[in-house]
């Protein structure tokens, strides 16, 4: 399965920011011409600001790299929108949203390749002190590498009012390369079976997802799912 051919350049560019310090400031000009400047000390805006900060660094090396739509997914495109990139930032413990659960399932049923293989995640860890953002670590991940599969639910997610709301990440240290797309598909299909959310025709959703996966990997994965227990048996021909 192919990924963005510029992945290595993007990863090295992002890694070069580890250790850097970023000051987010503001200047106000009043009607009388008086100005006032200061520093922004609010971690809630770091993610949005990082989009504007990161873009020119990558675009300098890759002229086909471009911003995505504001307040919508993805954060960046590459190669005439053929590849998608999502930016995630956190301090202390990852708590960002990967995607809305129902929305992600819907997108997978229509274009699994784009959401799983043509989208990658740029994940920055930072500290913020006195208005200064210090980038302390970075990882470039596939979606299946940032999910936890050993918790209360088949995949790590946020539950609100007994409904499964947003898909959430695992710990930063647990974002590792030995997780596989097959595990992600297996656990996701189990989640579709068990979710209390209203999803029309869960079995067809699962079949659509598995069919796309098999076509891309030329495999013959079968999922036997017990609708009462959510038990899953997976039989792939080969690992992705």
Language model features: what each stretch is:
Residues 1-72, 83, 89-240:
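Nucleic-acid endonuclease domains
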Residues 76-81:
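Active-site beta-strand termini and strand-to-loop segments that position acidic
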């Amino acid at each position: 399965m192919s990924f963005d051919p510029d992945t290595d350049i993007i990863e090295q560019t992002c890694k070069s920011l580890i250790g850097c310090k970023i000051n987010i400031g503001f200047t106000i000009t009043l009607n009388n011409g008086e100005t006032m400047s200061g520093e922004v000390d609010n971690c809630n805006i770091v993610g949005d600001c990082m989009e504007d900060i990161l873009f020119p660094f990558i675009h300098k090396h890759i002229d086909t790299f471009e911003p995505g739509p504001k307040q919508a997914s993805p954060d960046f495109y590459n190669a005439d929108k053929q590849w998608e990139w999502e930016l995630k930032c956190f301090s202390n413990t990852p708590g960002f949203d990967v995607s809305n659960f129902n929305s992600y399932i819907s997108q997978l049923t229509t274009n699994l390749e784009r959401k799983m293989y043509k989208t990658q995640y740029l994940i920055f860890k930072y500290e913020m002190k006195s208005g200064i953002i210090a980038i302390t670590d970075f990882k470039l991940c596939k979606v299946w590498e940032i999910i936890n599969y050993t918790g209360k639910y088949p995949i790590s997610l946020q539950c609100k009012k007994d409904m499964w709301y947003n898909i959430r990440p695992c710990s930063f240290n647990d974002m590792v390369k030995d997780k596989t797309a097959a595990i992600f598909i297996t656990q996701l299909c189990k989640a579709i079976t068990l979710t209390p959310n209203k999803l029309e025709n869960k079995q067809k959703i699962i079949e659509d997802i598995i069919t796309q996966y098999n076509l891309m990997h030329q495999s013959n994965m079968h999922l036997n799912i017990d609708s009462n227990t959510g038990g899953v048996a997976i039989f792939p021909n080969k690992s992705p």
